[in-house]
């Protein structure tokens, strides 16, 4: 990203303005009268008028749409062809050698940190127990950062952005993700489904927001009451955030939490009688899960084998060196990895400016614009390989390797115009603040109060905390 978006008030939309990429003067072109046009026939004029009427009708169809900040919204009107054409060809090039260099760098960071702490942060060198506790706590944070970077490399493998060779990508990703207790192929397939259905209320596979009806059911309230409930207490918000950061990732793998729950529609019939939740038959470990197709079953088994080998290795190390040591060496850093994965993914897809679409109004281009870039400073750029900084372009062209994503991201901004979203204020501190802000602002989605026709199929975040655009009042309905 070339530059951070200037800090603005909380009610402002963080957007990049459209920039013209051609030398055409659209204003002077439009000012040419039919008589001066090279095509002066009646049919030409009539077609022009019809086109203008269609455009006006289309515009009116989406009038009255407001995001959570109260900004007017219209759906994207560019095409995926426009996006792909704007990206320089060399951005698509993948280098196996360069990718492995980053793997080695991350492994070196992990091993060097372990060596230094294991050999120097000892009772002999540091007699103070409190000081050793603080230093080993720092160790868990550092290892969590480095391991998250390695996890991101595995994510690259899942998109075949690691190498032109699918075999090399999958083998590398399987090893990396298995070591981090991630079922590689299982997650690869569900993540692919997420990319294909991003922003679709019936297809998206991750951080799909609740509808007003679902939120009311969760709270045990009538739908009409939701907008008039008292404000959620900050302590409740904080506890919810802590719980999500601790167990959000394993909960997603085991129950498909935050994914869609329309499994009855699985085309092979694998979703009949299955639903999200513990014991519901929807998870990332069972080859029969409706998340997958029958042809993918053998890869789910391979993912489970990878997890089995990793768990066996951890059990051996725990018995060999002690479980207290393993808690510090592996399991606490693992919790930090969980935290970063959930935080990054949540904030990539949740923001007061972002819409969601019903099935009838969704398409791939609109879905790709349901994402936002975030700035994590040095940590995001270098340790996390830019996964939060260039997520928008990643959703349009996922095979672009992360080391080319900055240039590709800059290339598509003029095409996306106002539909490109970024929140880059205050770096890592701003990122963590965004966790709190989105939890308070983004609680469910519903249509805009003044939406008409097709516009009712475009949903925006609302909340009970009296923040931003008010929810629809149903008292008189």
UniProtKB/Swiss-Prot annotation:
One of its GO terms (biological process) is fatty acid biosynthetic process. It is an enzyme of class 1 (oxidoreductase). Pathway: Lipid metabolism; monounsaturated fatty acid biosynthesis. Keywords: Endoplasmic reticulum, Fatty acid biosynthesis, Fatty acid metabolism, Lipid biosynthesis, Lipid metabolism, Membrane, Microsome, Monooxygenase, Oxidoreductase, Transmembrane, Transmembrane helix. One of its GO terms (cellular component) is endoplasmic reticulum. InterPro entries: FA_desaturase_dom, FAS_N, Fatty_acid_desaturase. It catalyses: (9Z)-octadecenoate + AH2 + O2 = (12R)-hydroxy-(9Z)-octadecenoate + A + H2O. A motif (Histidine box-1) lies at residues 155-159. Belongs to the fatty acid desaturase type 1 family. This is Oleate hydroxylase FAH12. It comes from Claviceps purpurea. The lineage of its organism: Eukaryota, Fungi, Dikarya, Ascomycota, Pezizomycotina. The gene is FAH12.
